[in-house]
């Protein structure tokens, strides 16, 4: 597997970072969640993701919103979804970054998400046998998530 670099250079003294690789989640859900979480405080982001998993707060879909139903509540836009699987995976990556910050001696109460992004991973290629000796591709896309947490003052 190729070495994957972080998109943003950060000062290692007051930042902690983590990466989730080869996650089997939707690329579109990951893009919308990363856009929504960017710049949030870590505690607020974890609470937000837990509310999304519990189907209480929808994630506004601003780019990939074709044929999406409207959701009640103030979410910024009218259309949104509850990407539970992607929220759980991103929550695991954020927890890993928080533990890395604890290991470095940073104050976990004063952490905010400086950078979060989703990148396309490799495609797991499979084939489904069909009638009359044919086969159809059944591919699974994977996603890489990068998180950099910064201690603010």
UniProtKB/Swiss-Prot annotation:
It holds the Pfam family Ribosomal_L22. InterPro entries: Ribosomal_uL22 (IPR001063), Ribosomal_uL22_CS (IPR018260), Ribosomal_uL22_euk/arc (IPR005721), Ribosomal_uL22_sf (IPR036394). Coiled coil: none annotated. Keywords: Ribonucleoprotein, Ribosomal protein, RNA-binding, rRNA-binding. GO terms for cellular component: cytosolic large ribosomal subunit. GO terms for biological process: cytoplasmic translation. GO terms for molecular function: rRNA binding; structural constituent of ribosome. The keyword Glycoprotein does not apply. PANTHER family: 60S RIBOSOMAL PROTEIN L17. This protein binds specifically to 23S rRNA. It makes multiple contacts with different domains of the 23S rRNA in the assembled 50S subunit and ribosome. The globular domain of the protein is located near the polypeptide exit tunnel on the outside of the subunit, while an extended beta-hairpin is found that lines the wall of the exit tunnel in the center of the 70S ribosome. Part of the 50S ribosomal subunit. Belongs to the universal ribosomal protein uL22 family. NCBIfam families: PRK04223.1, uL22_arch_euk. This is Large ribosomal subunit protein uL22. It comes from Methanococcus maripaludis (strain DSM 14266 / JCM 13030 / NBRC 101832 / S2 / LL). The gene is rpl22.
